[in-house]
Amino acid sequence: MSFLATLKEPGTSVCLKNEPAQSPSLHDHAPSTAAISREYIANLFDMPFMDLLLKAQGVHRQHFTANAVQISTLLSIKTGNCPEDCGYCSQSGHHRDTTGLQAEKRLEIDKVIAAAKRAKASGSSRFCMGAAWKHPSAKDMPYVAELIKEVKALGLETCMTLGMLTAEQSEQLAEAGLDYYNHNLDTSRRYYDEVVSTRSYDERLQTINHVRKSGINVCSGSIVGMGESREDRIDWVLELASMPLPPESIPVNLLVPIQGTPLGDKVLSEGQLPVLEWIRTIAVTRICCPSSYVRLSAGRESLSDAEQALAFMAGANSFFYGDKLLTTGNASQSNDDRMMQMLGLIPEAPKPKLTVIDALSGHQSQL
């Protein structure tokens, strides 16, 4: 069997010689989520790097079109002065004296729509909108609902990240037609208190549960390289894979250390995580959450073409387009276009939810 045939037939029973009996087989199909244990995830992390990437790419091709990537654009619709104290974030009001970030009010709706039109013209299929809030207020909800409707009218998928949500707010976003809601876990439960103190881990899980129950697709990921251990990365993957339904979209961020933030200063002082460990995390995420989109998010700006190519080989199939992610830099659009052409990557078309209205009851539902 040739190497290429092995890639196309990841279910083959061929195994590596001398492979530990407890380890995941190189060519196994992705396990059911019920079969994923902490030991299984730890063994994935311990696999030889090339074997892990080969396995992850095989799993990826079982569930997604090879070389197709979903492209998103992210816009900050309200910047800075956030009451949360996330140790990595320049938008926190707790760090404004050391980061120098200038807070901005909510963007006018017409400016957001203009940005969405530019995103669509550039090739993005999803438009993501983020606000530096602990949670949206009642007066914010009509504003965000209008944004969702206007962006969907352009034929784009919609995503929002607005902080914590109540069950009622989740329902309001669903009624407006929101496709995805982002609420990252950031790290493991064990390391979480080193990252933020103003929002608990369980509160994050509660918001994700509200979003899931409302019928909105869940987007939830991590930030790798904040000083956490591999054990924390194992626990984070297990948390997602153990959910009744893992997130449809999983961003795996590589920390961009921002001077003036507690975690940024810590990493700049102690040294950054090797990029290959971030790529390992992507591969393990792909294997354990095989039906989820795995997105390259923050941290790409500093990566070489080869490092990003390895990330796509590891099973990533989504990334953010545009020169800026909220307040941090991103790889330039022209550079991404060049890289996609070089790697043979193909943009995926948008698949926004459709609103169906029952002719008798008038009830609206999403397809």
From Swiss-Prot:
Where's the Radical SAM core domain? 67-291
- One example of a Gene Ontology biological process annotation: biotin biosynthetic process
Hey, which family's this protein in? Answer: Belongs to the radical SAM superfamily. Biotin synthase family.
Q: Where does [2Fe-2S] cluster bind?
A: 128, 159, 219, 295
Q: In which pathway does it act?
A: Cofactor biosynthesis; biotin biosynthesis; biotin from 7,8-diaminononanoate: step 2/2
Reply yes or no: does the keyword Iron apply.
yes
Alphabetically ordered keywords of this record: 2Fe-2S, 4Fe-4S, Biotin biosynthesis, Iron, Iron-sulfur, Metal-binding, S-adenosyl-L-methionine, Transferase
Which cofactors are reported in the record for this sequence? [4Fe-4S] cluster; [2Fe-2S] cluster
Cofactor binding, per record: Binds 1 [4Fe-4S] cluster. The cluster is coordinated with 3 cysteines and an exchangeable S-adenosyl-L-methionine. Binds 1 [2Fe-2S] cluster. The cluster is coordinated with 3 cysteines and 1 arginine.
Can you provide one Gene Ontology molecular function annotated for this UniProt record?
Answer: 2 iron, 2 sulfur cluster binding
Which chemical reaction does it catalyze? (4R,5S)-dethiobiotin + (sulfur carrier)-SH + 2 reduced [2Fe-2S]-[ferredoxin] + 2 S-adenosyl-L-methionine = (sulfur carrier)-H + biotin + 2 5'-deoxyadenosine + 2 L-methionine + 2 oxidized [2Fe-2S]-[ferredoxin]
Read off the Pfam families from this record: BATS, Radical_SAM
Q: Which InterPro entries match?
A: Aldolase_TIM (IPR013785), BATS_dom (IPR010722), Biotin_synth/BioAB (IPR002684), Biotin_synthase (IPR024177), Elp3/MiaA/NifB-like_rSAM (IPR006638), rSAM (IPR007197)
> Which named protein is this?
Biotin synthase
Keyword 4Fe-4S appears in the UniProt entry = yes
Enzyme Commission number(s) = 2.8.1.6
PANTHER family from the entry?
BIOTIN SYNTHASE (PTHR22976), BIOTIN SYNTHASE, MITOCHONDRIAL (PTHR22976:SF2)
**What top-level class of enzyme does the UniProt entry assign?**
transferase
Task: Specify which residues bind [4Fe-4S] cluster according to the UniProt entry for this protein.
Answer: 82, 86, 89
